[in-house]
């Protein structure tokens, strides 16, 4: 059993008080409180600055160490070959290391750290979910071995291009929002994809998605889109988010016969006649259309006019409305 049984007292300066020497506890966990047969060890928010020796827990499958002070992944983790889930969310990690022996890992969360490069994952061939949100990653790379991946989350990084993921043919959900991507590309072979989320990038054209026959949700808000052309082949799409763009026409949306949700608020559509195209979508339930020019033209009648035109809709913007007219 590990010797990590009691908290360690260290002296850290308090903010705005350089003279303070009040002790602050680190590693505030006691492994003796866990059953040796426990499949799950949760050391979240314990001010841990290292991963303790957990060899005394032979059946451990899940390790959670969120919101701690880890600056590196301790070599001690290499012995935890039974792990299927590792969560090191919100620490101070700068690189991915010492994970090679964790060959049974199915889920890995390294979000909210300071990681600059994706690497060290070659042996994790069973991995199905990988979270790398809010790091300092500039390039998608070194994912060649992760062919079983079903969910990849790379939001809030510094990525400029969608690349090196074409082999991830089992991918179901892809999140790369809030990056620096200028072109929608590199996803053509991901035919199992059901969710593609790219909000907050610099995309100006919807393209290279015509092969994504299983796509159900497409998120493209906060870009530079001027129209919606390119979505027409996505006939199984249930949700389309193009809010806060430069869109002037809804032409093309009427082809999305399965659409339930259409989010297009904060765009540049001037004519209310554009709304009439949406009346063809019999399954449409929710629309977000406010703060387009046609909204400001007649704010008092806006909601009523939408209700009269889109009789099938049950929610307009953030407010529900009466049941659709039969």
Swiss-Prot record:
The organism's place on the tree of life at top rank: Eukaryota
GO biological process terms on file: negative regulation of centriole replication
Alphabetical list of InterPro entries matching this protein: Cilia_flagella_integrity, Leu-rich_rpt, Leu-rich_rpt_4, Leu-rich_rpt_typical-subtyp, LRR_dom_sf, U2A'_phosphoprotein32A_C
Protein localization: Nucleus
Keyword field: Leucine-rich repeat, Nucleus, Repeat
Region spans: Disordered: 1-22
GO annotations of cellular component type: cytoplasm; nucleus
LRR repeats: 35-57, 58-80, 81-102, 103-126, 128-146, 147-170, 172-190, 191-212, 213-236, 238-256, 257-280, 281-304
UniProt entry tagged with the keyword RNA-binding: no
Gene3D superfamilies per record: Ribonuclease Inhibitor
This protein's record includes keyword Cell division: no
Chain's role: Regulatory subunit of protein phosphatase 1.
Family recorded in the similarity comment: Belongs to the SDS22 family.
UniProt cross-references to PANTHER family, sorted A to Z: PROTEIN PHOSPHATASE 1 REGULATORY SUBUNIT 7 (PTHR45973:SF23), PROTEIN PHOSPHATASE 1 REGULATORY SUBUNIT SDS22-RELATED (PTHR45973)
Identification of the protein by name: Protein phosphatase 1 regulatory subunit SDS22 homolog
Species the sequence originates in: Caenorhabditis elegans
Annotated gene: sds-22
